[in-house]
From Swiss-Prot:
InterPro entries: Carboh/pur_kinase_PfkB_CS, DKG_kinase_firmi, Myo_inos_IolC, Myo_inos_IolC-like_sf, PfkB_Carbo_kinase, PfkB_dom, Ribokinase-like. Pathway: Polyol metabolism; myo-inositol degradation into acetyl-CoA; acetyl-CoA from myo-inositol: step 5/7. It comes from the Bacteria. One of its GO terms (molecular function) is 5-dehydro-2-deoxygluconokinase activity. Catalyzes the phosphorylation of 5-dehydro-2-deoxy-D-gluconate (2-deoxy-5-keto-D-gluconate or DKG) to 6-phospho-5-dehydro-2-deoxy-D-gluconate (DKGP). It comes from Bacillus velezensis (strain DSM 23117 / BGSC 10A6 / LMG 26770 / FZB42) (Bacillus amyloliquefaciens subsp. plantarum). CDD domains: KdgK (cd01166). GO terms for biological process: inositol catabolic process. Its EC number is 2.7.1.92. Gene3D superfamilies: 3.40.1190.20, putative 5-dehydro-2- deoxygluconokinase. This is 5-dehydro-2-deoxygluconokinase. It is an enzyme of class 2 (transferase). Belongs to the carbohydrate kinase PfkB family. Keywords: ATP-binding, Kinase, Nucleotide-binding, Transferase.
Length: 330
């Protein structure tokens, strides 16, 4: 089964939300208190997905707000260098800064992030800074859950979703739950549900769907039944090492297993998964193959130091899939 888009659109994907700075520990297996050197990368889920999509050959654009400083200029320059259109990235003139994420890599199983997100520029994207014509010219709009955490970014995203629905642009909601940006579980559930019910494709981990539903131990069947009663026609639920599932409105269920790899760190997997899954759909692969692309891409990124810089090319993804299938005798 294949997923179809309006092929008359110029952009394959336009993402909206945060673009920030990742400072990843260059010294492994030690606590942050003892870490002295970090490597700088562009971070933020929607920015990573846009970068990953561009590296896979898709035409990607980005809507967001950056600070008027060295970090802001680095973000724009880096994304442009990776092929992302940044014409809709506005500059904050009020002195707000980029979000900073310091990562600690104690072991492949124990990684943590120290996040600085107070009064950051990306959460001050105004609805008036969302261009209708730009979104209307995309096959899909990628929305990140974190952008819903505060106003005015929240209203800017809701406006973008409204525009997409108006112009036959598929809405892809990457749940991207980050607890440090939200005031309460109830608030998170309200806004996640609001956008999920308007989305054509919803992607997240089982835990993130539980956050959206404000409960624990939820089941996939109940989740997809609720979303299919609204706008969704494809729901992807990830279960970590147990693989991922895609549920279609027509009743079909697809599964991809997680690919074995030497894990360096745990962050970045979700963004690389989303970009490769989207690439698979846009390039005309069937849903099961797109799931495999997502799983393979995630396994590549968790084996490397960065998230955005480690986003693989299509050839790397296909090579890994073929190698694993050969190893498994398939």
């Amino acid at each position: 089964m294949k997923y179809t888009f309006n092929e008359e659109k110029e952009f394959d994907i336009v993402a909206i939300g945060r673009a920030c700075i990742d400072l990843n520990a260059a010294e492994y297996n030690r606590p942050m208190e003892e870490t002295m050197t970090f490597s700088k990368y562009v971070g933020g889920s929607p920015a990573n997905i846009a970068i990953g999509s561009a590296k896979l050959g898709l035409k990607a654009g980005f809507i967001g707000k950056i600070p008027d400083d060295q970090h802001g200029r680095f973000i724009v320059s880096y994304m442009q260098g990776k092929g992302v259109d940044t014409s809709q990235m506005t500059v904050d003139r009020e002195g707000r800064k980029a979000g900073l994420a310091f990562t600690e890599i104690l072991s492949p199983e124990e990684c943590s992030i120290l996040m600085y997100r107070d009064d950051v520029a990306d959460l001050y994207l105004e609805p008036s800074e969302v261009n209708e014509g730009y979104i209307a010219n995309a096959k899909m709009l990628l929305v990140s859950g974190t952008a819903l955490a505060k106003s005015p970014s929240r209203e800017a995203v809701l406006k973008a979703v409204h525009i997409a629905k108006k112009h036959d642009v598929k809405v892809v909601f990457e749940l991207d739950y980050r607890p440090y940006t939200w005031q309460s579980a109830e608030e998170t559930a309200v806004y996640y549900t609001l956008v999920a019910e308007q989305s054509d494709i919803v992607i997240g981990t089982r835990d993130e769907f539980d956050v959206m539903e404000n409960r624990s131990g939820g089941g996939n069947d109940e989740t997809v039944r609720h979303l299919f009663a609204h706008s969704a026609d494809l729901v992807v639920i990830k279960h970590g090492v147990d693989g991922s599932y895609a549920y279609s409105r027509s009743g079909e269920v697809f599964r991809a297993h997680a690919y074995k790899t030497k894990v360096l760190k745990t962050f970045g997997a979700g963004d690389s998964y989303a970009s490769a899954f989207i690439y698979g759909l846009v390039s005309g692969r069937d849903i099961e193959t797109a799931l495999k692309y997502g799983s393979a891409s995630a396994s590549i990124v968790v084996s490397k130091h960065s998230s955005s810089e480690a986003m693989p090319a299509a050839g790397e993804i296909i090579e890994l899939i073929e190698a694993q299938h050969s190893l498994n005798g398939k």
